[in-house]
Design a protein with these regions (language model features):
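Mature extracytoplasmic or organellar-lumen-exposed domains after removal of signal/transit peptides
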Residues: 1-226
């Protein structure tokens, strides 16, 4: 919110926006495509199946595809300036709205790239740990790479000529309606998981309590990944 000359980390609004794009969006899509999906895929193709499975995030819970697609949702939320689902409209004070006002085609392609990465991941056969190779996995890796390339290239470039544009409203919307609610949700769901685990510890022979703890863990994963 206070990205200006008096801020030790972000000396301008556009500096903060660029950090969101590179350290946020691009790093996330690259990690999902090249590391979370790509590393196990490469090992599996090399015949190192056992090692490949251990490289899969959440392999023990079969929650990997949900985790990866939720990572892409986090990019969508940041770009749209609000927490929501794929296909939801962007807020008026958002990175998307700014880009659209300057280059509607780029905004449409960025939105399509986010949607494309999400849908490609969701199209992979589940559970990922048992289906580490194949055309759908390759498509997901490629879609994430396309999103990373577009973000680091044209999208980042769109802010090089921002001049003295005041990004305060966009950054405030991002902080208040994306970042803060996400951490609040994470805190609340982490507490619910803690309580569920306490109940399970007190009676670890109860299947209902095992199921409740599993459900609480999965619920807590959502804000963590998004």
């Amino acid at each position: 919110r206070t990205a200006d000359a008096g801020n030790a980390k972000f000396t301008s609004g556009v500096d903060a926006i660029r950090t969101i794009l590179v350290d946020g969006f691009a790093n996330i899509s690259n990690e999902v495509g090249s590391s979370k999906i790509g590393n196990p895929n490469t090992l599996a193709k090399d015949g190192k199946t056992a090692e490949a499975v251990l490289q899969v995030e959440s392999w023990y819970s079969w929650n990997s595809i949900t985790d990866y697609s939720d990572n892409i949702i986090s990019i969508k939320n940041g770009y749209a300036g609000r927490i929501g689902a794929i296909g939801d409209a962007a807020h008026a004070n958002s990175i998307s709205a700014y880009v659209k006002s300057r280059n509607a085609d780029l905004d449409a392609r960025m939105t399509a790239a986010i949607d494309g990465a999400y849908n490609a991941i969701k199209s992979m056969q589940s559970p990922f740990r048992n289906n580490l190779t194949g055309t759908k996995v390759d498509a997901a890796i490629e879609a994430c790479a396309d999103l990373t390339e577009l973000t680091e290239g044209e999208l980042l470039g769109a802010f090089r000529d921002a001049g003295d544009y005041d990004f305060t409203s966009i950054l405030t919307q991002y902080a208040d309606q994306v970042v803060t609610p996400t951490y609040k949700d994470m805190k609340e769901k982490a507490w619910m998981l803690y309580k569920a685990m306490q109940a399970l510890q007190a009676d670890n022979k109860s299947q209902a309590k095992v199921d409740a703890a599993c459900a609480a863990w999965r619920a807590m994963r959502v804000p963590w990944e998004q």
